Curated annotation (Swiss-Prot):
Biological process annotations from GO: gluconeogenesis; glucose 6-phosphate metabolic process; glycolytic process
Lineage of source species: Bacteria, Pseudomonadati, Pseudomonadota, Gammaproteobacteria, Pasteurellales
Keyword tags: Cytoplasm, Gluconeogenesis, Glycolysis, Isomerase
UniProt organism field: Haemophilus ducreyi (strain 35000HP / ATCC 700724)
Pfam families from the UniProt entry: PGI (PF00342)
Gene: pgi
Protein name (Swiss-Prot/TrEMBL): Glucose-6-phosphate isomerase
Intracellular or extracellular location(s): Cytoplasm
Enzyme class, UniProt record, top EC level: isomerase
Length: 547
Protein backbone atom coordinates (compact mmCIF):
# COMPACT_ATOMS: atom_id res chain seq x y z
CA UNK A 1 0.00 0.00 0.00
CA UNK A 2 1.27 3.41 -0.93
CA UNK A 3 1.89 6.17 1.60
CA UNK A 4 -0.22 9.13 0.49
CA UNK A 5 -1.29 11.98 2.77
CA UNK A 6 -4.82 12.74 1.52
CA UNK A 7 -4.51 16.44 2.32
CA UNK A 8 -1.67 16.71 -0.21
CA UNK A 9 -3.86 15.56 -3.09
CA UNK A 10 -5.43 17.89 -5.63
CA UNK A 11 -8.84 16.36 -4.93
CA UNK A 12 -8.64 17.16 -1.20
CA UNK A 13 -7.78 20.78 -1.91
CA UNK A 14 -10.64 20.99 -4.40
CA UNK A 15 -13.03 19.49 -1.84
CA UNK A 16 -11.99 22.15 0.69
CA UNK A 17 -12.96 24.79 -1.86
CA UNK A 18 -16.15 22.92 -2.76
CA UNK A 19 -17.22 22.88 0.90
CA UNK A 20 -17.59 26.67 0.70
CA UNK A 21 -20.59 26.19 -1.59
CA UNK A 22 -22.60 25.18 1.52
CA UNK A 23 -24.80 22.59 -0.14
CA UNK A 24 -28.26 22.25 1.40
CA UNK A 25 -30.16 18.97 1.28
CA UNK A 26 -33.59 20.64 0.91
CA UNK A 27 -32.24 22.88 -1.85
CA UNK A 28 -30.68 19.91 -3.66
CA UNK A 29 -34.06 18.15 -3.69
CA UNK A 30 -35.77 21.34 -4.86
CA UNK A 31 -33.35 21.53 -7.78
CA UNK A 32 -33.88 17.87 -8.70
CA UNK A 33 -37.26 16.41 -7.76
CA UNK A 34 -36.14 12.94 -8.86
CA UNK A 35 -32.89 13.09 -6.89
CA UNK A 36 -33.47 9.60 -5.47
CA UNK A 37 -33.05 8.05 -8.93
CA UNK A 38 -29.54 9.47 -9.19
CA UNK A 39 -28.37 8.78 -5.66
CA UNK A 40 -29.37 5.21 -4.88
CA UNK A 41 -27.54 1.94 -5.41
CA UNK A 42 -28.78 -1.65 -5.37
CA UNK A 43 -27.10 -4.91 -4.48
CA UNK A 44 -28.79 -7.78 -6.30
CA UNK A 45 -32.44 -7.99 -5.19
CA UNK A 46 -31.36 -7.80 -1.56
CA UNK A 47 -30.21 -4.33 -0.50
CA UNK A 48 -31.11 -0.79 -1.58
CA UNK A 49 -28.85 2.05 -0.44
CA UNK A 50 -30.35 5.54 -0.71
CA UNK A 51 -27.69 8.20 -0.12
CA UNK A 52 -29.66 11.06 -1.66
CA UNK A 53 -30.27 12.69 1.73
CA UNK A 54 -26.65 13.83 2.00
CA UNK A 55 -25.33 17.31 1.21
CA UNK A 56 -23.63 16.16 -1.98
CA UNK A 57 -24.01 16.76 -5.69
CA UNK A 58 -22.31 15.32 -8.75
CA UNK A 59 -19.34 17.63 -8.28
CA UNK A 60 -18.90 16.32 -4.73
CA UNK A 61 -18.93 12.73 -5.91
CA UNK A 62 -16.57 13.41 -8.80
CA UNK A 63 -14.05 15.01 -6.45
CA UNK A 64 -14.42 12.24 -3.86
CA UNK A 65 -13.86 9.58 -6.51
CA UNK A 66 -10.83 11.51 -7.68
CA UNK A 67 -9.58 11.47 -4.09
CA UNK A 68 -9.96 7.68 -4.08
CA UNK A 69 -7.92 7.47 -7.27
CA UNK A 70 -5.19 9.77 -6.01
CA UNK A 71 -4.99 7.74 -2.78
CA UNK A 72 -4.83 4.52 -4.83
CA UNK A 73 -7.82 2.76 -3.31
CA UNK A 74 -7.82 0.41 -6.28
CA UNK A 75 -4.22 -0.62 -5.68
CA UNK A 76 -4.88 -1.15 -1.97
CA UNK A 77 -7.95 -3.25 -2.75
CA UNK A 78 -5.96 -5.43 -5.12
CA UNK A 79 -3.22 -5.78 -2.53
CA UNK A 80 -5.67 -7.01 0.11
CA UNK A 81 -7.44 -9.47 -2.17
CA UNK A 82 -4.15 -10.88 -3.47
CA UNK A 83 -2.80 -11.64 -0.01
CA UNK A 84 -0.15 -8.94 0.26
CA UNK A 85 0.88 -8.13 3.83
CA UNK A 86 -0.97 -4.83 4.07
CA UNK A 87 -0.96 -5.03 7.88
CA UNK A 88 2.59 -3.72 7.88
CA UNK A 89 3.02 -3.12 11.61
CA UNK A 90 2.42 -6.82 12.28
CA UNK A 91 3.73 -8.06 8.90
CA UNK A 92 0.49 -9.89 8.15
CA UNK A 93 -1.83 -10.38 5.23
CA UNK A 94 -5.47 -9.35 5.67
CA UNK A 95 -7.56 -12.17 4.28
CA UNK A 96 -10.96 -12.45 5.92
CA UNK A 97 -12.16 -12.48 2.31
CA UNK A 98 -10.50 -15.91 1.93
CA UNK A 99 -12.77 -17.33 4.62
CA UNK A 100 -15.80 -16.75 2.37
CA UNK A 101 -14.05 -17.41 -0.95
CA UNK A 102 -16.86 -19.60 -2.27
CA UNK A 103 -15.26 -19.98 -5.71
CA UNK A 104 -12.34 -21.65 -3.93
CA UNK A 105 -9.91 -19.68 -6.06
CA UNK A 106 -6.33 -20.04 -4.83
CA UNK A 107 -5.16 -17.24 -2.53
CA UNK A 108 -1.51 -17.26 -1.54
CA UNK A 109 0.30 -16.09 1.58
CA UNK A 110 4.06 -16.60 1.64
CA UNK A 111 3.74 -18.75 -1.47
CA UNK A 112 1.19 -21.12 0.08
CA UNK A 113 -2.45 -21.42 -0.96
CA UNK A 114 -4.55 -20.84 2.16
CA UNK A 115 -7.76 -22.33 0.75
CA UNK A 116 -7.10 -26.03 1.58
CA UNK A 117 -6.71 -25.10 5.26
CA UNK A 118 -9.81 -22.86 5.17
CA UNK A 119 -11.87 -25.64 3.62
CA UNK A 120 -10.56 -28.22 6.08
CA UNK A 121 -11.66 -26.11 9.06
CA UNK A 122 -15.08 -25.52 7.48
CA UNK A 123 -15.50 -29.26 6.96
CA UNK A 124 -14.50 -29.88 10.57
CA UNK A 125 -16.99 -27.25 11.79
CA UNK A 126 -19.72 -28.88 9.71
CA UNK A 127 -19.07 -32.38 11.04
CA UNK A 128 -18.79 -31.25 14.65
CA UNK A 129 -21.87 -29.03 14.58
CA UNK A 130 -24.01 -31.73 13.00
CA UNK A 131 -22.97 -34.15 15.72
CA UNK A 132 -23.94 -31.68 18.46
CA UNK A 133 -27.20 -30.56 16.83
CA UNK A 134 -28.34 -34.14 16.19
CA UNK A 135 -27.64 -35.06 19.80
CA UNK A 136 -24.86 -37.51 18.98
CA UNK A 137 -22.32 -35.54 21.02
CA UNK A 138 -22.83 -36.59 24.64
CA UNK A 139 -21.81 -34.99 27.89
CA UNK A 140 -20.14 -36.85 30.75
CA UNK A 141 -23.43 -38.42 31.90
CA UNK A 142 -24.44 -39.48 28.39
CA UNK A 143 -26.94 -36.68 27.85
CA UNK A 144 -27.13 -34.61 24.66
CA UNK A 145 -26.10 -30.96 24.61
CA UNK A 146 -28.84 -28.37 25.17
CA UNK A 147 -26.81 -25.22 25.86
CA UNK A 148 -23.69 -23.70 24.34
CA UNK A 149 -21.56 -21.03 26.03
CA UNK A 150 -19.17 -19.03 23.86
CA UNK A 151 -16.37 -17.55 25.98
CA UNK A 152 -14.40 -14.86 24.16
CA UNK A 153 -13.89 -11.13 24.03
CA UNK A 154 -13.72 -8.49 21.33
CA UNK A 155 -14.06 -10.07 17.91
CA UNK A 156 -14.38 -13.51 19.47
CA UNK A 157 -17.59 -12.36 21.12
CA UNK A 158 -19.10 -9.34 19.37
CA UNK A 159 -19.35 -10.89 15.91
CA UNK A 160 -20.81 -14.28 16.84
CA UNK A 161 -23.18 -12.67 19.35
CA UNK A 162 -24.38 -10.10 16.82
CA UNK A 163 -24.98 -12.72 14.12
CA UNK A 164 -26.71 -15.27 16.34
CA UNK A 165 -29.04 -12.53 17.58
CA UNK A 166 -29.64 -11.21 14.06
CA UNK A 167 -30.50 -14.71 12.82
CA UNK A 168 -32.61 -15.90 15.73
CA UNK A 169 -35.47 -16.78 13.35
CA UNK A 170 -33.16 -19.48 11.95
CA UNK A 171 -31.99 -20.94 15.27
CA UNK A 172 -32.42 -24.57 16.24
CA UNK A 173 -33.11 -26.07 19.67
CA UNK A 174 -29.70 -25.23 21.14
CA UNK A 175 -29.63 -22.33 23.59
CA UNK A 176 -26.73 -19.93 22.99
CA UNK A 177 -24.99 -17.92 25.71
CA UNK A 178 -22.09 -15.47 25.40
CA UNK A 179 -19.60 -14.53 28.11
CA UNK A 180 -16.97 -11.85 27.56
CA UNK A 181 -16.48 -9.61 30.59
CA UNK A 182 -13.84 -10.58 33.14
CA UNK A 183 -16.30 -9.32 35.76
CA UNK A 184 -17.25 -12.56 37.50
CA UNK A 185 -20.89 -11.53 37.41
CA UNK A 186 -21.05 -12.27 33.68
CA UNK A 187 -19.95 -15.91 33.87
CA UNK A 188 -21.78 -16.48 37.18
CA UNK A 189 -25.13 -15.32 35.79
CA UNK A 190 -24.80 -17.54 32.72
CA UNK A 191 -23.74 -20.62 34.70
CA UNK A 192 -26.81 -20.25 36.91
CA UNK A 193 -29.00 -20.81 33.85
CA UNK A 194 -27.44 -24.01 32.56
CA UNK A 195 -26.89 -27.64 33.52
CA UNK A 196 -23.26 -28.86 33.52
CA UNK A 197 -24.40 -32.25 32.21
CA UNK A 198 -25.78 -30.73 28.99
CA UNK A 199 -23.59 -27.66 28.41
CA UNK A 200 -20.88 -27.27 25.80
CA UNK A 201 -18.31 -24.47 26.25
CA UNK A 202 -16.45 -22.90 23.33
CA UNK A 203 -13.25 -21.15 24.42
CA UNK A 204 -12.32 -18.61 21.75
CA UNK A 205 -8.75 -17.39 22.07
CA UNK A 206 -6.14 -17.66 19.33
CA UNK A 207 -3.27 -17.84 21.84
CA UNK A 208 -5.33 -19.45 24.63
CA UNK A 209 -3.79 -16.84 26.92
CA UNK A 210 -6.23 -13.90 26.64
CA UNK A 211 -6.71 -12.79 30.26
CA UNK A 212 -10.46 -12.19 30.24
CA UNK A 213 -11.26 -15.29 28.19
CA UNK A 214 -9.05 -17.70 30.11
CA UNK A 215 -10.20 -16.37 33.50
CA UNK A 216 -13.78 -17.15 32.48
CA UNK A 217 -12.77 -20.48 30.94
CA UNK A 218 -11.07 -21.67 34.13
CA UNK A 219 -14.12 -20.63 36.17
CA UNK A 220 -16.36 -22.59 33.82
CA UNK A 221 -14.07 -25.61 34.12
CA UNK A 222 -14.17 -25.41 37.93
CA UNK A 223 -17.98 -25.23 37.74
CA UNK A 224 -18.09 -28.36 35.57
CA UNK A 225 -15.64 -30.33 37.70
CA UNK A 226 -17.49 -29.43 40.90
CA UNK A 227 -20.34 -31.46 39.45
CA UNK A 228 -18.50 -34.10 37.40
CA UNK A 229 -15.59 -34.68 39.80
CA UNK A 230 -13.62 -36.24 36.94
CA UNK A 231 -11.03 -34.41 34.82
CA UNK A 232 -11.99 -36.47 31.77
CA UNK A 233 -15.33 -34.62 31.68
CA UNK A 234 -13.56 -31.49 30.43
CA UNK A 235 -12.94 -33.03 27.00
CA UNK A 236 -16.66 -33.80 26.64
CA UNK A 237 -17.81 -30.28 27.48
CA UNK A 238 -15.09 -27.95 26.18
CA UNK A 239 -13.74 -27.22 22.71
CA UNK A 240 -11.15 -24.63 21.68
CA UNK A 241 -11.11 -22.04 18.93
CA UNK A 242 -7.35 -21.57 19.03
CA UNK A 243 -3.97 -22.35 17.51
CA UNK A 244 -2.08 -23.13 20.74
CA UNK A 245 -2.42 -26.91 20.86
CA UNK A 246 -0.04 -27.35 23.81
CA UNK A 247 -1.95 -25.01 26.13
CA UNK A 248 -5.29 -26.32 24.88
CA UNK A 249 -4.24 -29.87 25.79
CA UNK A 250 -3.04 -28.76 29.25
CA UNK A 251 -6.48 -27.25 29.85
CA UNK A 252 -7.99 -30.70 29.28
CA UNK A 253 -9.42 -30.21 25.79
CA UNK A 254 -8.84 -32.91 23.18
CA UNK A 255 -6.84 -31.21 20.41
CA UNK A 256 -9.05 -33.06 17.92
CA UNK A 257 -11.68 -30.60 19.09
CA UNK A 258 -9.50 -27.56 18.48
CA UNK A 259 -10.59 -25.38 15.57
CA UNK A 260 -7.79 -23.26 14.18
CA UNK A 261 -7.67 -19.90 12.47
CA UNK A 262 -4.75 -17.87 11.22
CA UNK A 263 -2.82 -14.68 11.91
CA UNK A 264 -4.18 -13.18 8.68
CA UNK A 265 -7.63 -13.17 10.29
CA UNK A 266 -8.11 -10.09 12.45
CA UNK A 267 -10.30 -10.54 15.52
CA UNK A 268 -12.93 -8.05 14.38
CA UNK A 269 -13.17 -9.87 11.04
CA UNK A 270 -13.14 -13.40 12.47
CA UNK A 271 -16.83 -14.38 12.61
CA UNK A 272 -16.33 -16.01 9.19
CA UNK A 273 -13.68 -18.34 10.65
CA UNK A 274 -13.71 -20.99 13.36
CA UNK A 275 -14.71 -18.15 15.70
CA UNK A 276 -18.11 -18.51 14.03
CA UNK A 277 -18.59 -22.02 15.44
CA UNK A 278 -21.24 -20.68 17.83
CA UNK A 279 -23.10 -19.32 14.79
CA UNK A 280 -22.93 -22.73 13.10
CA UNK A 281 -24.22 -24.44 16.24
CA UNK A 282 -27.05 -21.91 16.49
CA UNK A 283 -28.35 -21.87 12.90
CA UNK A 284 -26.79 -24.95 11.29
CA UNK A 285 -24.02 -25.21 8.74
CA UNK A 286 -26.24 -24.70 5.68
CA UNK A 287 -27.33 -21.30 6.98
CA UNK A 288 -23.74 -20.44 7.90
CA UNK A 289 -22.78 -21.20 4.32
CA UNK A 290 -25.45 -18.75 3.16
CA UNK A 291 -23.89 -16.13 5.44
CA UNK A 292 -20.56 -16.78 3.71
CA UNK A 293 -22.23 -16.69 0.28
CA UNK A 294 -23.74 -13.27 0.97
CA UNK A 295 -20.40 -11.88 2.10
CA UNK A 296 -18.66 -13.40 -0.92
CA UNK A 297 -21.21 -11.79 -3.24
CA UNK A 298 -20.49 -8.40 -1.65
CA UNK A 299 -16.74 -9.07 -1.95
CA UNK A 300 -17.22 -9.58 -5.69
CA UNK A 301 -19.34 -6.44 -5.90
CA UNK A 302 -16.68 -4.40 -4.11
CA UNK A 303 -13.83 -5.80 -6.20
CA UNK A 304 -15.42 -5.71 -9.65
CA UNK A 305 -18.03 -2.92 -9.65
CA UNK A 306 -17.19 0.46 -11.15
CA UNK A 307 -16.74 3.34 -8.72
CA UNK A 308 -20.04 4.98 -9.68
CA UNK A 309 -22.04 1.88 -8.67
CA UNK A 310 -19.78 0.58 -5.91
CA UNK A 311 -21.71 0.59 -2.63
CA UNK A 312 -18.89 0.24 -0.03
CA UNK A 313 -16.76 2.79 -1.87
CA UNK A 314 -19.64 5.26 -2.13
CA UNK A 315 -20.54 4.92 1.55
CA UNK A 316 -16.91 5.45 2.53
CA UNK A 317 -16.60 8.55 0.35
CA UNK A 318 -19.81 10.08 1.70
CA UNK A 319 -18.56 9.41 5.23
CA UNK A 320 -15.26 11.14 4.43
CA UNK A 321 -17.20 14.14 3.11
CA UNK A 322 -19.38 14.37 6.21
CA UNK A 323 -16.57 13.89 8.70
CA UNK A 324 -13.54 15.53 7.15
CA UNK A 325 -15.20 18.40 5.33
CA UNK A 326 -18.56 19.07 7.00
CA UNK A 327 -17.19 18.66 10.52
CA UNK A 328 -19.04 15.63 11.84
CA UNK A 329 -16.99 13.55 14.28
CA UNK A 330 -19.45 10.73 14.76
CA UNK A 331 -21.82 8.42 12.89
CA UNK A 332 -24.90 6.67 14.23
CA UNK A 333 -26.01 3.23 13.04
CA UNK A 334 -29.74 2.88 13.64
CA UNK A 335 -31.27 -0.49 12.73
CA UNK A 336 -35.06 -0.61 12.60
CA UNK A 337 -35.04 -4.33 13.33
CA UNK A 338 -34.85 -5.74 16.84
CA UNK A 339 -32.86 -8.75 15.67
CA UNK A 340 -30.09 -6.32 14.65
CA UNK A 341 -29.88 -4.83 18.14
CA UNK A 342 -26.13 -5.63 18.40
CA UNK A 343 -25.24 -4.46 14.89
CA UNK A 344 -24.13 -0.97 15.95
CA UNK A 345 -22.02 -2.37 18.80
CA UNK A 346 -20.34 -4.78 16.41
CA UNK A 347 -19.35 -2.06 13.97
CA UNK A 348 -18.43 0.25 16.80
CA UNK A 349 -15.54 -2.14 17.28
CA UNK A 350 -15.15 -2.78 13.56
CA UNK A 351 -14.72 0.89 12.72
CA UNK A 352 -13.18 2.42 15.83
CA UNK A 353 -10.60 -0.31 16.41
CA UNK A 354 -9.70 -0.23 12.71
CA UNK A 355 -9.58 3.50 12.03
CA UNK A 356 -9.14 5.06 15.46
CA UNK A 357 -5.49 5.89 14.73
CA UNK A 358 -3.48 9.12 14.76
CA UNK A 359 -0.28 7.81 13.14
CA UNK A 360 -0.21 7.66 9.35
CA UNK A 361 1.43 4.99 7.24
CA UNK A 362 4.48 7.27 7.10
CA UNK A 363 4.93 6.90 10.87
CA UNK A 364 3.99 10.52 11.56
CA UNK A 365 1.00 12.09 13.30
CA UNK A 366 -1.75 12.96 10.84
CA UNK A 367 -3.05 16.52 10.41
CA UNK A 368 -6.68 15.58 9.79
CA UNK A 369 -9.47 13.67 11.47
CA UNK A 370 -9.44 9.89 11.09
CA UNK A 371 -12.08 7.41 12.24
CA UNK A 372 -15.40 8.76 13.51
CA UNK A 373 -17.06 7.72 16.75
CA UNK A 374 -19.59 4.97 15.97
CA UNK A 375 -22.63 4.29 18.11
CA UNK A 376 -26.32 3.51 17.87
CA UNK A 377 -29.35 1.63 19.12
CA UNK A 378 -32.36 0.03 17.45
CA UNK A 379 -35.29 2.17 16.33
CA UNK A 380 -37.74 3.14 17.60
CA UNK A 381 -36.12 2.99 21.05
CA UNK A 382 -33.53 5.57 20.06
CA UNK A 383 -36.25 8.02 19.06
CA UNK A 384 -37.22 8.22 22.73
CA UNK A 385 -33.62 8.55 23.89
CA UNK A 386 -31.08 10.46 21.78
CA UNK A 387 -32.82 11.54 18.56
CA UNK A 388 -33.55 14.88 20.24
CA UNK A 389 -29.87 15.75 19.97
CA UNK A 390 -29.62 14.47 16.38
CA UNK A 391 -32.56 16.68 15.34
CA UNK A 392 -31.96 19.82 17.39
CA UNK A 393 -28.51 19.54 18.95
CA UNK A 394 -25.42 21.46 17.95
CA UNK A 395 -23.43 18.43 16.76
CA UNK A 396 -23.73 17.14 13.20
CA UNK A 397 -24.43 13.40 13.38
CA UNK A 398 -24.72 11.56 10.06
CA UNK A 399 -26.90 8.47 10.45
CA UNK A 400 -27.28 5.12 8.73
CA UNK A 401 -30.89 3.94 8.98
CA UNK A 402 -31.24 0.19 8.33
CA UNK A 403 -34.54 -1.69 7.94
CA UNK A 404 -35.96 -4.84 6.34
CA UNK A 405 -38.97 -4.60 4.03
CA UNK A 406 -40.14 -8.02 5.21
CA UNK A 407 -40.39 -9.00 8.85
CA UNK A 408 -40.00 -12.41 10.44
CA UNK A 409 -42.83 -11.54 12.84
CA UNK A 410 -45.84 -10.11 10.95
CA UNK A 411 -47.88 -9.22 14.02
CA UNK A 412 -50.87 -6.96 13.33
CA UNK A 413 -49.58 -3.65 11.95
CA UNK A 414 -46.33 -3.60 13.94
CA UNK A 415 -44.08 -3.59 10.90
CA UNK A 416 -45.91 -0.81 9.09
CA UNK A 417 -45.69 1.33 12.22
CA UNK A 418 -42.00 0.54 12.56
CA UNK A 419 -41.25 1.37 8.92
CA UNK A 420 -43.36 4.53 9.01
CA UNK A 421 -40.92 5.78 11.65
CA UNK A 422 -37.94 4.62 9.57
CA UNK A 423 -39.13 6.66 6.58
CA UNK A 424 -40.27 9.64 8.66
CA UNK A 425 -37.01 10.12 10.54
CA UNK A 426 -34.81 10.53 7.47
CA UNK A 427 -37.37 12.91 5.95
CA UNK A 428 -37.49 14.96 9.15
CA UNK A 429 -33.72 15.09 9.44
CA UNK A 430 -33.28 16.15 5.83
CA UNK A 431 -36.03 18.75 5.52
CA UNK A 432 -36.78 19.84 9.08
CA UNK A 433 -39.60 22.24 9.88
CA UNK A 434 -39.31 25.97 9.23
CA UNK A 435 -40.55 28.82 11.38
CA UNK A 436 -43.28 29.51 8.81
CA UNK A 437 -44.48 25.89 9.01
CA UNK A 438 -44.58 26.04 12.81
CA UNK A 439 -46.56 29.29 12.73
CA UNK A 440 -48.98 27.84 10.18
CA UNK A 441 -49.60 24.82 12.41
CA UNK A 442 -50.44 27.10 15.33
CA UNK A 443 -52.74 29.19 13.14
CA UNK A 444 -54.56 26.06 12.01
CA UNK A 445 -55.04 25.19 15.69
CA UNK A 446 -56.80 28.53 16.16
CA UNK A 447 -53.99 30.24 18.05
CA UNK A 448 -52.75 33.73 17.28
CA UNK A 449 -49.10 34.27 16.44
CA UNK A 450 -48.85 36.74 19.29
CA UNK A 451 -49.73 34.15 21.92
CA UNK A 452 -47.32 31.51 20.54
CA UNK A 453 -44.38 33.68 19.47
CA UNK A 454 -42.29 32.68 22.49
CA UNK A 455 -42.68 28.95 21.84
CA UNK A 456 -42.20 29.00 18.05
CA UNK A 457 -38.35 28.90 18.06
CA UNK A 458 -38.35 25.70 20.12
CA UNK A 459 -40.43 23.86 17.53
CA UNK A 460 -38.24 24.74 14.55
CA UNK A 461 -36.14 21.95 13.02
CA UNK A 462 -33.28 23.20 10.85
CA UNK A 463 -33.04 20.00 8.81
CA UNK A 464 -30.07 19.49 6.47
CA UNK A 465 -28.96 16.50 8.58
CA UNK A 466 -27.31 13.80 6.43
CA UNK A 467 -28.56 10.21 6.40
CA UNK A 468 -28.21 6.99 4.44
CA UNK A 469 -31.21 4.68 4.20
CA UNK A 470 -30.27 1.02 3.82
CA UNK A 471 -33.32 -1.08 3.00
CA UNK A 472 -32.98 -4.86 3.05
CA UNK A 473 -35.53 -7.10 1.42
CA UNK A 474 -35.39 -9.34 4.51
CA UNK A 475 -32.81 -10.20 7.14
CA UNK A 476 -31.58 -13.62 6.04
CA UNK A 477 -28.21 -15.32 6.43
CA UNK A 478 -27.37 -14.27 2.86
CA UNK A 479 -28.42 -10.63 3.15
CA UNK A 480 -26.81 -10.28 6.58
CA UNK A 481 -23.53 -11.63 5.20
CA UNK A 482 -23.68 -9.06 2.41
CA UNK A 483 -24.54 -6.24 4.82
CA UNK A 484 -21.64 -7.06 7.16
CA UNK A 485 -19.18 -7.29 4.27
CA UNK A 486 -20.49 -3.98 2.91
CA UNK A 487 -19.54 -2.23 6.15
CA UNK A 488 -16.20 -4.07 6.34
CA UNK A 489 -15.20 -2.78 2.92
CA UNK A 490 -16.45 0.72 3.73
CA UNK A 491 -14.09 0.74 6.73
CA UNK A 492 -11.25 -0.55 4.56
CA UNK A 493 -11.68 2.26 2.02
CA UNK A 494 -11.79 4.87 4.79
CA UNK A 495 -8.55 3.52 6.23
CA UNK A 496 -6.85 3.72 2.84
CA UNK A 497 -7.98 7.33 2.44
CA UNK A 498 -6.89 8.18 5.98
CA UNK A 499 -3.44 6.75 5.12
CA UNK A 500 -3.44 4.60 8.26
CA UNK A 501 -3.06 0.89 9.00
CA UNK A 502 -6.58 -0.34 9.69
CA UNK A 503 -5.79 -3.90 10.70
CA UNK A 504 -3.68 -3.53 13.83
CA UNK A 505 -4.92 -2.36 17.23
CA UNK A 506 -1.96 -1.21 19.27
CA UNK A 507 -4.25 1.13 21.19
CA UNK A 508 -5.55 -1.75 23.28
CA UNK A 509 -2.09 -2.76 24.52
CA UNK A 510 -1.05 -0.05 27.00
CA UNK A 511 -4.02 -0.53 29.30
CA UNK A 512 -3.43 -4.29 29.34
CA UNK A 513 0.25 -3.81 30.19
CA UNK A 514 -0.56 -1.50 33.08
CA UNK A 515 -3.30 -3.83 34.34
CA UNK A 516 -0.79 -6.70 34.45
CA UNK A 517 1.50 -4.48 36.51
CA UNK A 518 -1.27 -3.43 38.90
CA UNK A 519 -2.76 -6.90 39.44
CA UNK A 520 0.00 -8.16 41.81
CA UNK A 521 -0.35 -4.94 43.82
CA UNK A 522 -3.96 -5.87 44.60
CA UNK A 523 -3.04 -9.18 46.23
CA UNK A 524 -2.21 -7.70 49.65
CA UNK A 525 -3.42 -4.87 51.86
CA UNK A 526 -0.25 -2.76 51.69
CA UNK A 527 -0.68 0.87 50.57
CA UNK A 528 0.34 1.47 46.97
CA UNK A 529 2.61 4.42 46.17
CA UNK A 530 4.10 3.40 42.81
CA UNK A 531 1.69 5.30 40.54
CA UNK A 532 0.45 8.86 40.17
CA UNK A 533 -1.53 10.24 43.12
CA UNK A 534 -4.90 9.61 41.46
CA UNK A 535 -4.22 5.95 40.65
CA UNK A 536 -2.62 5.38 44.07
CA UNK A 537 -5.63 6.95 45.78
CA UNK A 538 -8.13 4.83 43.85
CA UNK A 539 -6.24 1.58 44.49
CA UNK A 540 -5.87 2.31 48.19
CA UNK A 541 -9.55 3.19 48.58
CA UNK A 542 -10.44 -0.05 46.80
CA UNK A 543 -8.26 -1.97 49.26
CA UNK A 544 -9.89 -0.22 52.20
CA UNK A 545 -13.42 -1.00 51.01
CA UNK A 546 -13.09 -4.53 49.65
CA UNK A 547 -14.19 -7.42 51.77
Amino acid sequence: MRNINPTDTMAWQALVQHKAEHLSIPQLFAENEDRFATYNLSFEDQILVDYSKNAINQKTLTLLRQLAKECDVDGARQAMFSGEKINRTENRAVLHIALRNRANKAIFVDGKDVMPAVNAVLAKMKAFSEKVIKGDWKGYTGKAITDVINIGIGGSDLGPYMVTEALRPYKNHLNMHFVSNVDGTHIAEVLRKVNPETTLVLVASKTFTTQETMTNAFSAREWLLADAKDQSAVAKHFVALSTNSETVAKFGIDTENMFEFWDWVGGRYSLWSAIGLSIVLSIGFANFEQLLEGAYAMDKHFYHTADEQNIPLTLALVSIWNNNFLGAQTEAILPYDQYLHRFAAYFQQGNMESNGKYIGRDGKAVNYQTGPIIWGEPGTNGQHAFYQLIHQGTTLIPCDFIAPAQTHNPLSDHHNKLLSNFFAQTEALAFGKSKAQVELEFTQQGKSLDEVKDIVPFKVFTGNKPTNSILLKKVTPYSLGALIAMYEHKIFVQGVLFNIYSFDQWGVELGKQLANRILPELEDDQPVVSHDSSTNGLINQFKAWRE
